[in-house]
A protein has these predicted regions:
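N-terminal "cap/leader" segments of large eukaryotic alpha-helical scaffolds
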Residues: 1-148, 181, 185, 198-206, ...
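C-terminal/domain-terminus segments
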Residues: 515-539
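Short helix-loop boundary/capping segments at the starts of domains
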Residues: 141-148, 158, 163, 167-170, ...
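Leucine-rich repeat
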Residues: 147, 197-198, 245, 289
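Alpha-helical solenoid repeats of the armadillo/HEAT superfamily
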Residues: 124-138, 169-192, 205-242, 252-253, ...
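HEAT/HEAT-like alpha-solenoid repeats
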Residues: 118-125, 145, 151-152, 157-162, ...
C-alpha cells in the first residue's frame, strides 16, 4: 500500500478497533466477485477485519489485500515520515550533471562498440541500446535546472546528443528529439537567460536544424512513436524561433521549408502533424522576406494553391482542419508581400481560385478575400488587378460590396474587416487598372441609377462617425494625461484601427470615380442630403497623403502624393 492510499483511507467510526480474528464465522458469499456499491451496508460498517478467504474490501476505495485500517498514531507516524523523508530525486547540481553525462557517454560508446562487433545480431547490442535510451531519459532532469545548460554545452553534451540523431535505431533519435524539445521549452528558457543563450548558440553552431531535418526525412509517421518524434521536432523549431526570430531564416535554409512543403503534398490523412506543419510554415514567412522569396523559388505558391483548392467547394471537416486552412491562407498572404511571388500567384491561376471561392460562399471565402487584397495592393499588384477584371471578377466583388454577408459562427470575418478588404480591393483596381479594364470598372458605379455610389456614400458616413467617435475618445484621454505622454504615431495608428483606414479607402474611391461630372454631381447631392461636406473628404485625403507609405521608397511615395493631391484639387 502506498502513502497516498494510506492517507486517503478513512477507517470506520467504531468505539474500538476490532480484532483481526473477531467473528470467525463471517460469511463468505463473495466468491471472488467485487461487491456492488449497495451491497450490505450494515455488515460493512461492522466487518472491518479481513480473513484469508475474504479478500474484498467492503468500502469504496479498492485497496490491496492488506489490513485497511490504521490507528491515529500510525497516521501521525506516516505524516511525519512523509514530511521528514528526503525526496527520491534530489535537485540536480553540477556534480550530478557531470556524473550523468559521464554515464551517458559511456553508454554511447558501449552501444557503438556492440553494434560494430555484432552488426547483424540485434540480440547482442539490444541491451546496450536499452541502457543508452535509459541514460537519455535520465538527462530530462537537466531541463529542470536551466542554469546548468552552460555546463551541459561545455561538457559536449549537446554535441553528443545531436550525433545520436543519426543513430541507426530511430527510437534513439526520437528519444533525443523528445529531450531537446523539453530542453528548449520556452517557459524553461525564460527561467535562465544565460542558459538559454548558451544552449541556442550551441545548437546553431552545431547545425542542429539541418540534423533535425535529416532525421525528419527518415521518420515513418505510420509508427506512432515516430509520428510523435515529428511533432516534437516541429516544436523544437517553434521554440527556437520564438526566442530568436532570426533563426527562422537559418532553419529554412537548412531544409525545413522544403521538408514542410513535401509533407503538405504527401497523400496522408489530415492529422495533428499536418496542422503543425501549416503553423510552422506561417511562422517562417510572416516576418522574413528572404523566406517568402525562398518559398516562391521552390514552388511553394503552387503547393499552397493546390492545398487550398480542396476547400473551394467543401468546408473543412473539423475545427482543426479549419485552422489548417486558415494557416495556409495566412501563409499565402505573407508570401504575396514579396514582389517576386505576385507573378507566380498570377501564373498559378490563384486569382481564378480565389474568385471561385468567393462565389461558392464556403468558409474559404474569408481567406480568399484577404488573399485578393494582398495580391492586388500597391504598384506590384497591377497585373493581378487587370487580370481580375478580365476573369469577370467584378461580377463577384461588387455584390459583396453592395451587401456585407451576415456574420455567424461559421463566417468568422467581422463586418468591418469584410468591408475593409472589399473597399481595399476596389481602391487597388481603381489605382492600377488602365485602358478598357478601368472603363469597365468605372461603368459599374453608374449602373442601376448609381446604386454603388449610394452604397459608397453610406460607407463614408458610417466610418466617418466611427472616426469622430474615436477622436472624441482620444481627446478625452489627452485631457486626463500629460501632454508629454502622448505619441503622435501611436495616436494615428489607433485612429487607423478605429475606422480611419477604411474611411481613407472609401474617400479615395470617391475621388477616383468622381472624374465624370455626372458621378460628381450625384456625390454632391448625397452629401447635401445628409448634411455632409466636400471639405471633410478633402481633409481626410490630405491626411492620407501626408502619412502615405514609408521612407524606403521615396519615389513611389512622391508620385502617390502628387496623384492624390491632383484628385483633391479636381474634386
Amino acid at each position: 500500500m502506498d502513502v497516498g492510499e494510506l492517507l486517503s483511507f478513512k477507517p470506520e467510526q467504531t468505539p474500538k478497533r476490532p480484532s483481526d480474528f473477531d467473528r470467525p464465522d463471517d460469511d463468505e458469499d463473495d466468491d471472488g466477485g467485487s461487491p456492488g456499491p449497495k451491497a450490505r451496508p450494515q455488515q460493512r460498517a461492522q466487518k472491518v477485519r479481513r480473513t484469508e478467504q475474504d479478500t474484498h474490501v467492503r468500502s469504496k476505495p479498492v485497496l490491496p489485500a492488506k489490513e485497511p485500517q490504521i490507528s491515529e498514531q500510525e497516521r501521525l507516524d506516516i505524516l511525519k515520515f512523509v514530511e521528514t523523508e528526503e525526496p527520491d530525486g534530489e535537485v540536480l547540481d553540477e556534480s550530478g550533471l557531470k556524473k550523468m553525462l559521464l554515464l551517458f557517454e559511456k553508454r554511447v560508446l558501449k552501444n557503438q562498440e556492440m553494434r560494430i562487433k555484432f552488426p547483424d545480431n540485434a540480440e547482442k547490442f539490444m541491451e546496450s541500446e536499452i541502457e543508452l535510451n535509459d541514460a537519455i531519459q535520465e538527462l530530462h532532469a537537466v531541463a529542470t535546472v536551466p542554469d546548468l545548460y552552460p555546463l551541459l554545452v561545455e561538457l559536449n553534451g549537446v554535441a553528443s546528443l545531436l550525433e545520436l540523431l543519426s543513430h541507426q535505431n530511430a527510437d534513439i533519435s526520437v528519444a533525443v528529439v523528445d529531450l531537446l524539445q523539453e530542453l528548449t521549452d520556452v517557459d524553461i528558457l525564460h527561467e535562465s537567460l544565460e542558459g538559454a543563450e548558451t544552449l541556442i548558440e550551441a545548437l546553431r553552431n552545431q547545425q542542429a536544424a539541418g540534423l533535425l531535418v535529416q532525421n525528419l526525412e527518415r521518420l515513418q509517421e505510420t509508427v506512432k512513436e515516430e509520428a510523435d518524434g515529428v511533432h516534437n521536432t516541429l516544436a523544437i523549431f517553434e521554440n527556437l524561433i520564438e526566442i530568436r526570430p532570426e533563426i527562422a531564416k537559418e532553419v529554412a535554409e537548412q531544409g525545413l521549408l522544403q521538408w514542410i512543403l513535401k509533407r503538405l503534398r504527401a497523400k496522408l490523412p489530415f492529422d495533428a502533424n499536418k496542422l503543425y506543419c501549416s503553423e510552422i510554415l506561417s511562422i517562417l514567412v510572416q516576418d522574413s522576406n528572404e523566406n517568402r522569396i525562398m518559398l516562391g523559388t521552390i514552388d511553394g505558391i503552387d503547393v499552397l494553391l493546390q492545398q487550398l483548392a480542396a476547400y473551394k467547394r467543401h468546408d473543412p471537416n473539423s475545427a482543426e482542419e479549419q485552422e489548417f486552412m486558415e494557416n495556409l491562407f495566412n501563409t499565402l498572404c505573407s508570401a504575396l508581400m514579396a514582389r517576386e511571388n505576385r507573378d507566380k500567384f498570377l501564373k498559378g491561376e490563384g486569382l481564378q481560385l480565389m474568385n471561385l471561392m468567393l462565389r461558392e460562399k464556403k468558409l474559404s471565402r474569408n481567406g480568399s478575400l484577404k488573399v485578393l487584397d494582398h495580391a492586388m495592393s500597391g504598384p506590384d499588384g497591377r497585373d493581378n488587378c487587370n487580370k481580375f477584371v478580365d476573369i469577370l471578377g467584378l461580377r463577384t466583388i461588387f455584390p459583396l460590396f453592395m451587401k456585407t454577408p451576415k456574420r455567424n459562427k461559421n463566417r468568422l470575418l467581422g463586418t468591418d474587416e469584410h468591408e475593409e478588404h472589399i473597399v481595399s480591393i476596389i481602391a487597388s483596381m481603381l489605382h492600377n487598372c488602365k485602358g478598357s479594364q478601368r472603363q469597365r470598372l468605372l461603368a459599374k458605379f453608374t449602373e442601376n441609377d448609381f446604386e454603388k455610389i449610394e452604397r459608397l456614400m453610406e460607407l463614408h458616413r458610417k466610418y466617418l462617425d466611427k472616426v469622430e467617435a474615436m477622436d472624441r475618445e482620444i481627446d478625452q484621454q489627452m485631457r486626463t494625461e500629460d501632454d508629454d505622454e502622448q505619441d503622435d504615431d501611436a495616436i494615428y495608428v489607433k485612429r487607423l484601427s478605429g475606422g480611419l483606414f477604411t474611411l481613407q479607402l472609401v474617400d479615395y474611391i470617391i475621388l477616383e470615380v468622381s472624374c465624370t461630372d455626372v458621378v460628381k454631381q450625384r456625390v454632391l447631392k448625397i452629401l447635401n442630403l445628409h448634411h455632409g461636406s466636400m471639405k471633410t473628404i478633402r481633409h481626410v485625403m490630405r491626411e492620407y497623403a501626408g502619412n502615405l507609405g514609408d521612407a524606403s521608397d521615396s519615389d513611389w511615395r512622391e508620385q502617390e502624393q502628387a496623384h492624390i493631391l491632383q484628385l483633391i484639387d479636381r474634386f
